[in-house]
Amino acid sequence: GLNRVIVATGTSGVVLAKSNHIFTTDAYTLNGDITRQGTNISVVDGASGNILVASGTDYMGAIVDYSFESLVGSQRFGTVRVNFDSATAVMDETSTTDLNGNTDTVVFSVSVAGGNMTLSVANDIGSTIELVAVVNLIFRN
């Protein structure tokens, strides 16, 4: 297909289109086991934003490395891990110590509806946050 990753073979002038490394416009899939994608969202104060919506039939877990900064400079970096199926989801979060102010009122949550898991972030920090995340989705076998 036209969406394969091209790699050098070590032979001059020869390249190989890898069938187990697939790029789409938004994601990179490795060996049919892991999909990696990026997301960038702005969440105004007093609102929530969705970071990820994924099928519990297709995927069983997500690892989300994130960073965010508020418009007043408070920032945090961390990882959210989500274990889910088409009916239930649980999550945990680890993060750095805050910089330039408290970020305790920026809270991640997970829910399942219609077989899909949604990871969202609620912002009550007092200003808009800009969140950037790298999402690794693990396929269900």
Regions found by a protein language model. Give the residues of each.
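Beta-strand elements of well-folded, non-transmembrane domains
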Residues: 68-70, 84-86, 137-139
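Terminal beta-strand-rich extracellular "head" domains
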Residues: 81-103
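Surface-exposed ligand/attachment interfaces on beta-rich extracellular proteins
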Residues: 13-15, 35-61, 69-75, 88, ...
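Small-residue hinge/turn detector
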Residues: 5-8
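C-terminal interaction-tip segments
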Residues: 124-141
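Broad, structure-driven detector of short, well-ordered beta-strand segments within folded domains
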Residues: 21, 76-84, 106-110
